[in-house]
Amino acid sequence: MQDLRLILIIVGAIAIIALLVHGFWTSRKERSSMFRDRPLKRMKSKRDDDSYDEDVEDDEGVGEVRVHRVNHAPANAQEHEAARPSPQHQYLPPYASAQPRQPVQQPPEAQVPPQHAPRPAQPVQQPAYQPQPEQPLQQPVSPQVAPAPQPVHSAPQPAQQAFQPAEPVAAPQPEPVAEPAPVMDKPKRKEAVIIMNVAAHHGSELNGELLLNSIQQAGFIFGDMNIYHRHLSPDGSGPALFSLANMVKPGTFDPEMKDFTTPGVTIFMQVPSYGDELQNFKLMLQSAQHIADEVGGVVLDDQRRMMTPQKLREYQDIIREVKDANA
C-alpha cells in the first residue's frame, strides 16, 4: 500500500509539473505572438469598432453615414493598449446575434494612415473637430422627421376646401330693400246714397192702410216717379231731402193702398243734398223709426241687416267724406 501511495504521489507531482510547464510555455507563446501580430490585432480591433458602429447606426435607423474613431495615440500608448485585452470585445456579445452588413471593409485601412501616429495631440483634437461628419447625421434623420409635418400640412387642405365654398357667404352683399310703394290716398267720394229699410217681421207683410197713414204722418208726400218724398217743408214745398219707395220692384206705389201689402219699404237719401246732410240724415233715421213703430216692423241697413250703432257711424263718415270732397 505504501508503494502504491508513493507511486500516486510521484505521478501527481509529475502531472502538476507538466501542467505548470505547459502553462508557462503557452503564456510565453501567446505573448510572443501578441507582440508579433500587434498591427494585425490593431486592424482587427478597428474593424470590430467599425462593425460595432455600423450595428449601432443600424439600430438607430441611420443610413449610410458612419462615424469612425481614428486612434492616433502614440506608439507607447498603442503598445500599452495592445498589451491589455482589447476592450472592444467586451461590447461584441450584445451584438453577436446581429449580422454585420460588411464584415470586411477596405476603406478603414485607408483611413488609418501611419504618418498620423507620431502626433500625440490629435487624439484630443479629433473628437472636438468632428462637426463635419456630424452634419451628414442630420441628413438621414431628416427623412424620418419629414413625414411628420406632412399630415400637419395635409390637414389644412380639407379645411381650405371646406372653406372655399364659404367664401361667397363670408361677404354677403345686402340685398336692395324694396322701397314701399307710396300709398295712394283713396280718392274721396264726391257723392253717395244712404239707404235704410223698414221691413215686416219674418214671414209677414206690412198692411197698406197702416203703412199709408204712417208715411203721411212722417211728412212724406206722393210725387214724382210714383213714390213718396220728404221735402224741406212738411206741406211739400222746397227741395226733396230724401225719398221712400216700395221694396218690391218696380218700387212704385198706388195711392189707393187699402188692399195693398208689401214686405217693406226703402228710404234713401242722395248726398250731397240741400242743407246740412248730417241733419237730413238724422231726420231720415227718425222717419224710418216712426214708420217701423207704427206698422210693427224693424229698421234695417242697406244690406237688410239689423241697424247697429256701428252702421250709423259708418253712414255719418260717408256723409262727411262726401262733404269734404265737395268743399
From Swiss-Prot:
One of its GO terms (cellular component) is plasma membrane. Its main location: membrane. The chain crosses the membrane at residues 6-26. It comes from the Bacteria. Residues 41-185 are annotated as: Disordered. It is a single-pass type I membrane protein. InterPro entries: Cell_div_ZipA, ZipA_FtsZ-bd_C, ZipA_FtsZ-bd_C_sf. GO terms for biological process: division septum assembly; FtsZ-dependent cytokinesis. It is found in: Cell inner membrane. Pfam families: ZipA_C (PF04354). Coiled coil: none annotated. Residues 27-327 are cytoplasmic. Residues 1-5 are periplasmic. Residues 50-62 have a biased composition (Acidic residues). Keywords: Cell cycle, Cell division, Cell inner membrane, Cell membrane, Membrane, Transmembrane, Transmembrane helix. Residues 98-114, 122-170 have a biased composition (Low complexity). Belongs to the ZipA family. Essential cell division protein that stabilizes the FtsZ protofilaments by cross-linking them and that serves as a cytoplasmic membrane anchor for the Z ring. Also required for the recruitment to the septal ring of downstream cell division proteins. Interacts with FtsZ via their C-terminal domains. This is Cell division protein ZipA. The gene is zipA.
